Amino acid sequence: MTSSKTGQITIRSIGAGGDGVANLPDGQIYVPFTLPGEVVNVARDKNRATLMALLEASPERQNPACRHFEDCGGCALQHWQDEPYRLWKRELVVGALKGRGIDVEVAPLVACNPHTRRRAVFAARKTEKGVLLGFNRHQSHEIIDIVECPVTVPEIIARLDDLREVGALLAPGSGPFKLAATLTESGLDLAASGCGKLNDEQRRALTALVIKKDFARLSHEGEIIVEPKKPLIHFGKVPVPVPPGCFLQATAEAEETMAALVLAHLGKARRVADLFCGVGTFALRIAEKSAVHAVENDAAALAALDRGVRHVQGLKPVSIERRDLFRRPLMPKELLPYNAVVFDPPRAGAEEQALELAKSKVEKVVAISCNPVTLARDLAILQKGGYRIERVTPIDQFLWSAHVEAVAVLTKGRQ
């Protein structure tokens, strides 16, 4: 097959991005929504191809859980049965570690249930027929107007029409914008972006609608427009008033799993540094048994953590520090007071911090990541510095996607 022709190919594997991979004389091509062993007709465009016809289906193929699958770009792998899908996702972590020469125990993938994603960031656009609200088509800016989503919590999906009403008041002409909905204990927290400057009339109308529809809050580009109820989420026993757009783990059940792994490894550590702590996802749970120093560059997240701590008794001391750990990682001397360190950086990882941590005498480390490649890089740095990687646990909190969370626990010296 030439680089711009149609033809028949056989899928050999699933790539790291969730697409089927076929090996051709002039290189690999990637075909979404296919499975290993399948024979397919495709239309090729350089190293990518569109599935035109499924000629021989894999026995591992199943009916997708959503009517929008293959149109909506949110999911890549609903068509794959659970067992091979989970083995493949675990292998993403195993492969990344092996790529750095790390041979360590990788636990079976911890599965997460459908209907548990607590935040959805919808693409939206106003049309003559109303507001389109959903997700972008695979590798496109076209918005697929959804009526269901088996990934997202029902509390959000049940409010799609209400969200469209909010979108109609936000809409900047016919241009696209984003409307995120997060499930909190106080109700849905809405955060809009890309809508341009809101005028006074829009603000009044939005305020009335948010109150009428019983949403907890609406913000625009980080500015709170109306907040009938303070959006709260508990981390352990601490209720935290989460700021607009703050980082949260994708699902509450995955967060509980990660927290349990963190706490089990820390054991009786007296003092813990929680780096890239966010709003206190782990720090506030750790504080039930250990003194915690929570470090984060997001001022709003730190302020929310601090407000949560001030309203709960019985915690060990919690100190906070605003710091850009990419530019100013904690140095070995600064790490001397701590028995343990937890770090959960963005997808880019924590290379600079890992380099300093590797030189430290900290006895226990927990590394959490949504990117196996940067996690493996950081673990290799720590391993070179004398840390022993005890175990890595992959967690499927990004269901039917090519993304996977992982928690690694490490030790150094006598335990």
Swiss-Prot record:
One of its GO terms (molecular function) is 4 iron, 4 sulfur cluster binding. Pfam families: tRNA_U5-meth_tr. The keyword Lyase does not apply. Its EC number is 2.1.1.-. InterPro entries: MeTrfase_TrmA_AS, NA-bd_OB-fold, SAM-dependent_MTases_sf, U5_MeTrfase_fam. It comes from the Bacteria. GO terms for biological process: rRNA base methylation. The active site is at residue 370. It is an enzyme of class 2 (transferase). The keyword Methyltransferase applies. [4Fe-4S] cluster binds at residues 66, 72, 75, 149. S-adenosyl-L-methionine binds at residues 249, 276, 296, 344. Keywords: 4Fe-4S, Iron, Iron-sulfur, Metal-binding, Methyltransferase, S-adenosyl-L-methionine, Transferase. Belongs to the class I-like SAM-binding methyltransferase superfamily. RNA M5U methyltransferase family. This is Uncharacterized RNA methyltransferase BR0438/BS1330_I0439. It comes from Brucella suis biovar 1 (strain 1330). The lineage of its organism: Bacteria, Pseudomonadati, Pseudomonadota, Alphaproteobacteria, Hyphomicrobiales.
